[in-house]
Regions:
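Active-site loop/oxyanion-hole signature of alpha/beta-hydrolase fold enzymes
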Residues: 29-30, 39-81, 237
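Conserved HGGG/HGGXW glycine-rich cap/lid loop of the alpha/beta-hydrolase fold
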Residues: 6-52
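Catalytic active-site module of serine/aspartate enzymes centered on a nucleophile-bearing elbow/loop
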Residues: 215-258
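Alpha/beta-hydrolase fold catalytic core
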Residues: 1-16, 36-39, 74-76, 160, ...
Length: 258
């Protein structure tokens, strides 16, 4: 089963946090501290951290691993929060195990494949090896607003995920296609993106909002893929509002129809 960290296990509602590629469950430490009125569960996803031995094959299998963890917690359906890779996995969890989740907040993913050239795929493939360098990993983390260098490495300086795992996840993300699955997702879901996100992610917001029966989409003005790290207070406020079914923060912009 996936390794996980948890806090405040006696709280009534549980949030399961799903991290981005190249990180592990430690990335959610600040969010868990700010959301101390929730039971927060922060797993290391397949191929990452202390779950590195669980191979990444596809996002469906990864979602099944998260479902196994949620089932082991017992109790009521959980709230789900995902960033980037965690959002892809989280969406597949809603599709495959909807009974386990009462509400979800996802950021930084798209609903259909991103068209890239063979040359670009080759460059992305090559860049995965650069993440073997601790210096490069820390530079990448800082570009996302993550200032704690320890979060990109395990003890001894090893990366949280192998270059092979990073290549696999990159390929799965580029090819992700749930355009025909949106209508079937009935879980109450909030989909977010920074205003300077990749165009494919921004253009997916109206599709999520119109295609999923209980979906709301919002844009975080002036920020990009790593907005959760640069605006942790806004993120925590957003999660609390959505999961308690209160009005969303005014700092989020509405998404117009496609």
């Amino acid at each position: 089963m996936l390794h996980y960290r948890e806090s405040k296990p006696n709280q009534q509602k549980t949030i399961v946090f799903l991290h981005a590629a190249g990180f592990d469950g430690r990335i959610w430490k600040q969010a868990a501290e700010q959301l101390d009125d929730f039971h927060c569960v922060c797993p290391d996803l397949p191929g990452h951290g202390q779950s590195k031995a669980i191979q990444v094959t596809d996002f469906d299998a990864a979602s099944d691993a998260v479902a196994e963890l949620i089932g082991s917690l017992g109790g009521d359906p959980v709230c789900l929060a995902g960033l980037s890779m965690g959002s892809y996995i989280g969406f597949r969890l809603l599709a495959r195990h909807p009974h386990l989740v009462e509400g979800a907040v996802f950021s930084g993913f798209q609903h259909k494949p991103i068209e890239v050239s063979g040359v670009m795929r080759a460059l992305m493939h090559a860049s995965s090896f650069m993440m073997n360098s601790r210096k490069n990993r820390e530079k990448m983390a800082r570009s996302l607003g993550v200032n704690d260098p320890s979060l990109v490495s395990q003890r001894g300086g090893r990366p949280n995920a192998s270059s092979k795992t990073m290549r696999k996840i990159s390929s799965l993300a580029l090819d992700f296609d749930v355009s025909n699955d949106l209508q079937a997702i009935e879980t109450r879901t909030l989909v977010l993106a920074g205003e300077t996100e990749h165009p494919a992610i921004l253009s997916s917001l109206p599709a999520f909002q119109s295609g999923m029966p209980q979906c709301t989409a919002r844009i975080v003005p002036g920020l990009g893929h790593g907005w959760i790290a640069t605006e942790p207070d806004l993120y925590a406020e957003t999660l609390r509002a959505w999961f308690l079914q209160n009005p969303l923060p005014e700092g989020l912009n509405a998404v117009t129809a496609d």
